[in-house]
Amino acid sequence: MSDNAPAPKKPARNNGAVVMMCLSFVFGMGAMSYAAVPLYRIFCQVTGYNGTTQRVDQVSSVVLDRTMRVTFDANVAPGLQWDFKPVEREVNPKIGETIQVHFTAENRSNETQRGQAVFNVTPGEAGVYFNKVQCFCFTETDLKPGEKLDMPVVFYIDPEIVKAVESKDIHTVTLSYTFYPKEGPKPLALNEGGAVKSEKKL
């Protein structure tokens, strides 16, 4: 009588289940990557991470007897033929004081261009305390050929900045903007009478 017992049979692999698992993994990773950008943006807005400023609807009710030096930086990414710069290079508002500054943008190309401003604050620890009430960066900007636009920014520094360990010794912050080209339908050109110009078909 042989002592060699027959080897147990391996259960048949369910190929369908394996395929479904692989597909679920692929679709799951795709969904995560798609959601990563908006989730990261929300995270930055809530925490001020990476110098992201805050958008608010109300001004501060507290104004401290201490000033903060705020400098401004303006840049234009390739693809936009714009002259973009701050009117005021720096201001020294009291912490908690609401203040308005201005930037100008001029389209030096021969066509209408659309841009979107991206912003940040340095040092990054100050971002969560830099509150913007009004800003051209909240919307896209269209400029016709040769058009020049005055763009105000209304902001204040949250008084809480002097209480946080990581930010209480900050005395200068820089608000920086970069305009990037934004794709989208361009506004229809108008003739001198204000009517939409019709395109000639060949």
From Swiss-Prot:
GO biological process: respiratory chain complex IV assembly
Keyword entries, A-Z: Cell inner membrane, Cell membrane, Copper, Membrane, Signal-anchor, Transmembrane, Transmembrane helix
Highest taxon of source: Bacteria
Topological domains annotated Cytoplasmic: 1-13
Annotated GO CC locations: plasma membrane
An annotated Gene Ontology molecular function: copper ion binding
Periplasmic side of membrane: 37-202
Parts of the chain that traverse the membrane: 14-36
Alphabetized SUPFAM superfamilies for the sequence: Ctag/Cox11
Membrane topology term: Single-pass type II membrane protein
Membrane keyword on record: yes
Compartment list: Cell inner membrane
NCBIfam families attached to this UniProt entry: PRK05089.1
HAMAP family per UniProt: CtaG
Reported function: Exerts its effect at some terminal stage of cytochrome c oxidase synthesis, probably by being involved in the insertion of the copper B into subunit I.
Family of the protein in this entry: Belongs to the COX11/CtaG family.
Name this polypeptide is given: Cytochrome c oxidase assembly protein CtaG
Gene name for this UniProt entry: ctaG
